[in-house]
């Protein structure tokens, strides 16, 4: 109240449900299923269930789930395990075996066509940002400015050197894809990605993901997080292609608990919620 806040919002990083790749693929193929939450999870975690009940008991309010990506953190993510049940790192062959045929073919194609993937430096964020804006225009989303990524780089790498990286995929001297990568402990994230409209056939996006997966594993990560997906699975859903791209890696879709609000001023919180609905 001293800071004139009308609510507190949290987004617990606690996995509640998991759907393995075969389950997601079957759900996509089933015309009777239009949302991931309609498919039976392969696992519902006890911790997730307990935290959900505790939040509800303490008066926290779950945020309404809209279609597509919201302003906050995505509730549904796609993750790839980099270790086996005993905790041993997966080999390249094991990682490739978990992928679908299209992914394996595209990785091989990129290599055959001479796509090279390298790690960049801070100055290369400008090159990443150039095609990131091209991606934003093509895919109809509002991109962030270059200073945002430079600030992220400075802050994260000040905490721990090499926490944030930028990767560049090139073909015959042309930049065809670029990504940012973050690792904290044993969890690595594909943070932001970009690709050019030209030369999409050389499969730079597959090549750059393959490099990041292996680098994450070699750095000691046990999870490679491809981050957000939406839960829409209908054939005409505009985000279905994103899920199909990520599910091709193998891995699993996970649902976190979502974002929750604790109103401090019920009136102002209600007014804010109404504003968001009409925006």
Each model region followed by its residue ranges:
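Conserved beta-strand edge residues that scaffold enzyme active sites
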Residues: 13-14, 124, 230, 260
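A structural signal for short, well-ordered beta-strand segments and their strand-loop junctions
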Residues: 6-12, 38, 118-120, 168, ...
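Residue-level preference for short coil/turn positions at secondary-structure junctions
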Residues: 3-4, 74
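Hydrophobic pocket-lining residues that define ligand/cofactor binding sites across diverse proteins
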Residues: 1-3, 216
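Active-site/acyl-donor-binding loops of N-acyltransferases
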Residues: 21-85, 222-279
């Amino acid at each position: 109240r001293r800071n004139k806040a009308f609510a507190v919002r949290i987004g617990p990083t606690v996995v509640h449900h998991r759907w393995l790749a075969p389950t997601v693929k079957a759900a996509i193929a089933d015309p009777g299923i239009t949302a991931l939450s309609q498919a039976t999870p392969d696992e519902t975690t006890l911790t997730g269930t307990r935290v959900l009940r505790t939040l509800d008991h303490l008066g926290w309010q779950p945020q309404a789930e809209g279609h597509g990506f919201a302003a906050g953190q995505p509730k549904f993510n796609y993750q790839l395990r980099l270790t086996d049940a005993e905790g041993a790192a997966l080999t390249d062959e094991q990682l490739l075996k978990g992928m679908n045929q299209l992914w394996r073919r595209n990785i091989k194609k990129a290599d055959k066509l001479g796509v090279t993937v390298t790690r960049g430096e801070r100055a290369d964020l400008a090159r990443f940002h150039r095609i990131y804006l091209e991606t934003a225009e093509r895919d109809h989303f509002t991109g962030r400015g270059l200073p945002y990524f430079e600030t992220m780089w400075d802050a994260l790498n000040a905490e721990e050197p090499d926490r944030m990286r930028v990767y560049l995929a090139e073909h015959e001297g042309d930049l065809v894809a670029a990504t940012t990568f973050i690792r904290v402990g044993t969890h690595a994230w594909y943070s932001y990605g970009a690709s050019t409209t030209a030369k999409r056939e050389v499969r730079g996006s597959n090549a750059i993901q393959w490099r990041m997966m292996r680098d994450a594993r070699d750095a000691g990560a046990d999870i490679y997080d491809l981050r957000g997906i939406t839960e829409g699975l209908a054939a005409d859903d505009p985000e279905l292609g994103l899920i199909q791209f990520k599910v091709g890696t193998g891995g699993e879709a996970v649902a976190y608990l979502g974002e929750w609000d604790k109103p401090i001023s019920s009136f102002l919180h209600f007014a804010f919620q109404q504003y968001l609905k009409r925006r």
